[in-house]
Amino acid sequence: DINGAARFAERLAGGLVRKGHEVHIIAPAFDTSEGPRIENHDGVDMIVHRLRSHKVPQHKTLRWPEPWGMTGKIAKVLKEVRPHAVHIQSHLMVGRFALQAARRQRLRVIATNHVMPENLMRYSLLPKFLHPLAMKIIWADAGRILRKMDALTTPTKRAAELLEDAAKVSGVLAISCGIDASRFANNTPTDNSNPVALFLGRLD
């Protein structure tokens, strides 16, 4: 899937592997299968533990992992791998259960929040008049989960301020997702005679 959170996790994992670290990823499966496998992401091989999931009808690619037994499955992976830290990407399903499993094994947990409740509403089945209430509930739930982290980050300072205000958390670190600017550098000399507009927005 092409989205900011997925690309962030992919680049971070790939960068850690290239620096010699052992990285394990826990993520929903693309189909109804499950279990560990070797996958190539960001140009490197890594172990991905896939969780059984189901397609969300109102989204082209989003899959919803089965919650039944998820904590136990994640706990089994953590017990076998014994990571130095667990890094979750949201307070929702996988992140929530990973936190529970990690805490029981006294592992450090870091979270990078990518979730914006406003962006979830367009894929919900709720009537529009309920969206403000739903967003308030999601933010409150996010705060309840994210306050349990050993460290909490977001990609930008503005996102950190928003998270602290909306989810009532503190000490959020703004750490950029990082972009390899050399991949986008233009080797052809240019001038400013023709105006160029660049739009940066969501693909979905």
Summary of predicted features, one role per range:
Residues 55-59, 111-140:
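Acceptor-binding helix/loop patch of EC 2.4 sugar-transfer enzymes
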Residues 29, 158, 178:
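Carbohydrate-associated surface elements
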Residues 153, 189-204:
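Conserved donor-binding/catalytic core segment of Leloir-type glycosyltransferases
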Residues 85, 102-123, 153:
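Active-site proximal beta-strand in glycosyltransferases
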Residues 104, 116-117, 132-151, 166:
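Membrane-proximal helix-turn-helix segments that form the acceptor-binding/catalytic region
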Residues 176-185:
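Short beta-strand->alpha-helix junction loop in the catalytic core
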Residues 74-95, 99, 105-110:
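Short N-terminal targeting/anchoring amphipathic segment
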Residues 1-52:
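N-terminal subdomain of nucleotide-sugar transferases
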